[in-house]
């Protein structure tokens, strides 16, 4: 045993062990072991879009608890880390940080700046992840913008293209006018906004007045029809008639459709191309004409005597309303609160434009994807409903085209050869990764092709995060098929609940389309970290917690302890009280270990080397046997909890045992025996020291997944030169059990509790001598009586069985 330092310095020790673990490759994956013994994790690659906050630490450490446990029970851990460093989120970071705009620069120059920024940001991420002791294998690190990742992402696209699951179409899509790009349904969020319901006067072709309510009067020039519900008796007489739009005097058909809400507005609706999803449905089902008046920049393009050209949407709305009022065509306005679909990143209200884009088929696979969600093991189970609700709500195929620069390009060109103009040309697998702006399709010259200028949605690459580590996509598209087959599908996907609709859904979709299989067997979903007042953390509120400052104040083990005290999937508020409890636990572990170690030199070196099961007969004392039985039960409960991803229950049970059973009771009760100053009971002394030796060792192992630094330091001082975190170092007591009557030891604890309360009530020292304890309701064995005398400072104890319930009469010295 090493010399025990006087104090535990978490700053020095955490840095020391992080360096040693890295140097000794404690967490390295062994590629030579069989597939059966591997535990494979699809670690979330954090988006390089800003500073990591405490919420990231919260979820990443929860994954690490499970990974460390799996390693300790003997699994060969494949635990990579990646950085999602391409796409719109990263571009927005670069534009903000460098005060530039991508569209004002040369494409290559902007990409170069992006690469420099992500390199610096990833160094910060990497350092923080090491500081909080994520036990990842850093040799498995990847970046989603790297040549290898681009190759795998382009392989995914080509595989789906060959399978007929990808198509290119000129159709309505969601468009962000601020970032100037198409978006997918998963990239939007609903926001409540104050608006006006405007009641506008239309006329029939015959001159009859019709009132139509709308929140988008600026779309009047794009009106292509008027609809009513077929069961609405107010408007059945309008069948086969036409309406004349106000101001623009365009003739449009009046049609019946069951999607009209009779109780909304006047029950008459104008269909414009396009205001919402319903407009698209009507446009398609009724074969209506297309009138596009909104540009990609969010301005109006509509030459007319009513001059709207070049106005923003908001400006056009105001102008239209003013003119309608002037001409007495606006009969009423009502202030309403409406749900507006906005871009998740820019926050801008979305428009629906008709643009040629690439899509992955999604709608046709909804039923199959719902079945997949049932095949997956969800932790916690209630999170499954979120994905099912999302799948059921889908109404668009996945648009994967983005009109940006820093992303994975489509491996596509369009032919300009005479006779095949517009023909889609795609890269050969041997060419990947390709940049169609610089590279050429086989057999074509630069003059014969136009490159696809778009890049893929960042989720199109993130959705193959497992494959970025396995180096394969499918039977036909793989860089290393042997590696892919060994590592795919994976065991675990850890992630936060807010990206179930994106990362979880898209990864399941891609895996289903590529190989008709789930990408992983289990998914553990973490909640959000909230501010102390339970509000969402945000920079505008000034309540965002910076992990680096907390690490300086408390250290990684304490932060990890706080994270472990939150149930999986729950949104949890940051708590200073829990942080203080964690700090208290670190100190108590140190002091308890230091206390019990005083006597470890009395144990033989042989007894220290072997498992407790091999020398169980040397635990001779009844109270020692009782705590070992309790310890064995704890190990089983904690193991079962961690196997079911219930890390919070595992640490709760372990901490409760440590404080209540081991420190507060066992160490106090057995202390006199351990010292055995008069050499009265050498067998009882050896039994208690051996018990403390194994209980402390077991507790360190149970705490190790949560608090890796303090447990490593104590384990190295007390037990072994090998790391506590090595593969296969979990506790396994098998069927170890001492056949004892628990009523005796537990009766002792009941009596002790009564005595402690008595002394506290009368402000007596815990060591205050007692002349006599008169105990009824139980009779203890001789060795338990000696322990009870020692811990209560009682001169004598008398027992009788006149009561069923334990009662104690305490007599003090006069």
From Swiss-Prot:
Transmembrane segments: none annotated. It is an enzyme of class 6 (ligase). GO terms for cellular component: cytosol. It is found in: Cytoplasm. Keywords: Aminoacyl-tRNA synthetase, ATP-binding, Cytoplasm, Ligase, Nucleotide-binding, Protein biosynthesis. PANTHER family: VALINE--TRNA LIGASE, CHLOROPLASTIC_MITOCHONDRIAL 2 (PTHR11946:SF93), VALYL-TRNA SYNTHETASES (PTHR11946). ValRS has two distinct active sites: one for aminoacylation and one for editing. The misactivated threonine is translocated from the active site to the editing site. This is Valine--tRNA ligase. The gene is valS.
């Amino acid at each position: 045993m090493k010399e025990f330092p006087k104090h535990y310095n978490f700053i020095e020790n955490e840095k020391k062990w992080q360096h040693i673990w890295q140097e000794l490759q404690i967490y390295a994956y062994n590629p030579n072991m069989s597939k059966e013994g591997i535990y494979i994790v699809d670690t979330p690659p954090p988006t390089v879009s800003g500073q990591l906050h405490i919420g990231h630490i919260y979820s990443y450490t929860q994954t690490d608890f499970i990974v460390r446990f799996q390693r300790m029970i003997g699994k060969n851990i494949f635990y990579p880390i990646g950085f999602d460093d391409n796409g719109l989120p990263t571009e927005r970071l670069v534009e903000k940080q460098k005060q530039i705009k991508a569209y004002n620069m040369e494409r290559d120059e902007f990409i170069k700046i992006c690469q420099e920024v992500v390199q610096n940001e990833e160094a910060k991420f990497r350092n923080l992840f090491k500081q909080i002791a994520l036990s990842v294998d850093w040799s498995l690190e990847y970046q989603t913008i790297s040549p290898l990742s681009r190759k795998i992402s382009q392989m995914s696209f080509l595989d789906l293209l060959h399978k007929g699951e990808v198509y290119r179409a000129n159709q309505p899509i969601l468009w962000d006018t601020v970032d100037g790009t198409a978006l997918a349904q998963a990239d939007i969020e609903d926001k409540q906004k104050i608006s006006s319901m405007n009641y506008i006067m239309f006329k029939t072709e015959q001159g009859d007045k019709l009132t139509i309510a709308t929140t988008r009067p600026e779309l009047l020039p794009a009106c292509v029809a008027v609809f009513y519900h077929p069961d609405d008796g107010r408007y059945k007489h309008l069948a086969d008639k036409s309406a004349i739009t106000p101001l623009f005097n365009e003739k449009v058909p009046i049609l019946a459709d069951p999607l009209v809400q009779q109780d909304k507005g006047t029950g008459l609706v104008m269909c414009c191309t396009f205001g919402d999803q319903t407009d698209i449905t009507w446009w398609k089902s009724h074969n209506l004409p297309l009138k596009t008046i909104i540009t990609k920049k969010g301005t109006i393009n509509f030459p007319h005597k009513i001059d709207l050209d070049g106005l923003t949407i908001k400006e056009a709305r105001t102008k239209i309303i003013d003119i309608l009022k002037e001409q007495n065509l606006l009969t009423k306005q009502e202030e309403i609160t409406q749900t507006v679909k906005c871009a998740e990143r820019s926050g801008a209200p979305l428009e629906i434009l008709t643009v040629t884009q690439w899509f992955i088929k999604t709608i046709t696979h909804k039923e199959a994807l719902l079945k997949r969600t049932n095949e997956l093991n969800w932790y916690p189970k209630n999170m499954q409903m979120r994905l099912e609700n999302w799948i059921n709500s889908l109404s668009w195929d996945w648009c994967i085209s983005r009109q940006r620069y820093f992303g994975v390009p489509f491996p596509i060109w369009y032919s300009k050869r005479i006779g095949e103009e517009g023909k889609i040309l795609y890269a050969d697998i041997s060419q990947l990764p390709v940049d169609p702006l610089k590279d050429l399709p086989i057999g074509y010259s630069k003059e014969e092709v136009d490159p696809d200028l778009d890049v893929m949605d960042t989720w199109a690459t993130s959705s193959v995060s497992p494959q970025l580590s396995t180096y394969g996509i499918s039977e036909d598209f793989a860089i290393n098929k042997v590696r892919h087959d060994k590592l795919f599908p994976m065991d675990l996907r850890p992630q936060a609940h807010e990206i179930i609709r994106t990362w979880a859904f898209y990864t399941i979709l891609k895996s289903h389309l590529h190989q008709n299989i789930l990408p992983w067997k289990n998914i553990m979903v973490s909640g959000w970290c909230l501010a102390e007042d339970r509000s969402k953390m945000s920079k505008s509120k000034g309540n965002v917690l910076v992990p680096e400052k907390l690490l300086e104040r408390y250290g990684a083990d304490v932060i990890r302890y706080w994270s472990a005290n939150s149930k999986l999937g729950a949104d949890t508020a940051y708590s200073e009280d829990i942080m203080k409890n964690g700090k208290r636990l670190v100190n108590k572990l140190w002091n308890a270990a230091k206390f019990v170690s005083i006597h470890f030199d009395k144990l033989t070196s042989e007894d220290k080397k072997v498992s407790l099961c091999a020398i169980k007969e040397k635990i001779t004392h009844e109270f020692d046997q009782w705590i070992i039985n309790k310890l064995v039960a704890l190990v089983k409960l904690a193991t079962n909890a961690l196997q079911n991803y219930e890390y919070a229950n595992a640490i709760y049970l372990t901490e409760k045992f440590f404080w209540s059973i081991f420190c507060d009771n066992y160490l106090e009760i057995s202390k006199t025996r351990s010292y055995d100053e008069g050499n009265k009971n050498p067998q009882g002394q050896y039994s208690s020291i051996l018990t403390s030796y194994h209980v402390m060792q077991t507790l360190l192992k149970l705490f190790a997944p949560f608090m890796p630094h303090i447990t490593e330091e104590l384990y190295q001082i007390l037990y072994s030169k090998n790391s506590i975190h090595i593969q296969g170092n979990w506790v396994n007591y098998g069927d170890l059990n001492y056949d004892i009557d628990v009523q005796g030891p537990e009766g002792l604890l009941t009596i002790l509790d009564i005595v402690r309360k008595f002394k506290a009530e009368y402000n007596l020292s815990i060591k205050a001598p007692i002349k006599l304890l008169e105990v009824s309701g139980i009779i203890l064995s001789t060795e338990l009586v000696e322990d009870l005398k020692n811990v209560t400072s009682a001169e004598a104890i008398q027992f009788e069985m006149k009561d069923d319930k334990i009662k104690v009469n305490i007599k003090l010295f006069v």
